[in-house]
Curated annotation (Swiss-Prot):
Its EC number is 7.1.1.-. InterPro entries: NADH_UbQ_OxRdtase-like_20kDa (IPR006137), NADH_UQ_OxRdtase_20Kd_su (IPR006138). GO terms for molecular function: 4 iron, 4 sulfur cluster binding; iron ion binding; NADH dehydrogenase (ubiquinone) activity; NADH:ubiquinone reductase (non-electrogenic) activity; quinone binding. It is a peripheral membrane protein. NDH-1 is composed of 14 different subunits. Subunits NuoB, C, D, E, F, and G constitute the peripheral sector of the complex. Its cofactor is [4Fe-4S] cluster. [4Fe-4S] cluster binds at residues 65-66, 131, 160. Binds 1 [4Fe-4S] cluster. This is NADH-quinone oxidoreductase subunit B. It comes from the Bacteria. Belongs to the complex I 20 kDa subunit family. GO terms for cellular component: plasma membrane; respiratory chain complex I.
């Protein structure tokens, strides 16, 4: 059997030298991939946000024709349940995301505000359609020029009306935003020990203001 010696070619296509990666300590690399290295607080926030983004309960609230497209996302064609948001709630006290689908009239504004206040924390709002975003083509006295003038909005979905795919994309953007949030939990551990923020419900927090009211506002005012 004869052998021949050839000089190594670094530019060869077979086993190119420039793509080889060396591992200094394979045990350390294996540990970093399988063992969590970080703060317990970060892990708790990540776990809580993961559960929140995959269990969004929308509030069944439609004000105009955009609600037809919103309802289409619940059908088998689009299947909103893939994103954990198929549990539609009829009560704001059981929902954590309000999807304002359609035109917001001046007479609806106090109702939307009150329903938003009744939602439990943490809560989010998706503005769906041009009318909910900026009033749309209704630049008149009876239409609120954007639902963000009465309640805070997290995600805007453009369109007149937007397609169901656009709403699903907006929901995915909201889930991505929830993943990066650091909202206060019920109780967690910090450098000073166990900390539990005092988060009063809206009913108790605004009880003194309601008692002090002498003249009730008109239902068609903002």
């Amino acid at each position: 059997m004869k052998y021949t010696l050839t000089r190594a070619n670094p530019d060869a296509d077979t086993y190119p030298a420039q793509t080889r990666q060396t591992v200094n300590n394979p045990i350390e690399d294996e540990v970093n991939r399988n063992v969590f290295m970080g703060k317990l607080e970060d892990m708790v926030h990540a776990s809580a946000n993961w559960g929140r983004k995959n269990s969004l309960w929308p509030f069944n609230f439609g004000t105009s024709c955009c609600y037809v497209e919103y309802a289409t996302t619940l059908t088998a064609v689009h299947d909103l349940s893939r994103f954990g948001a198929e549990v539609i709630r009829a009560s704001p006290r059981q929902a954590d995301v309000m999807i304002v689908a359609g035109t917001c009239f001046v007479k609806m504004a106090p109702v939307i505000q009150r329903l938003y206040e009744q939602m439990l924390e943490p809560k989010w709002v998706i503005s769906m359609g041009s009318c909910a975003n900026s009033g749309g083509m209704y630049d008149i006295y009876s239409v609120v020029q954007g639902v963000d003038k009465i309640i805070p909005v997290d995600v805007y979905v453009p369109g007149c009306p937007p397609r169901p795919e656009a709403l699903i994309q907006g929901l995915m953007l909201l889930q991505e935003s929830i993943t990066k949030e650091r909202r206060p939990l019920g109780a967690y551990v910090n450098d000073k020990g166990i900390y539990q923020p005092q988060m009063l419900p809206e009913r108790d927090r605004k009880q003194a203001d309601r008692i002090a009211v002498k003249n009730l506002r008109s239902p068609d005012s903002i």
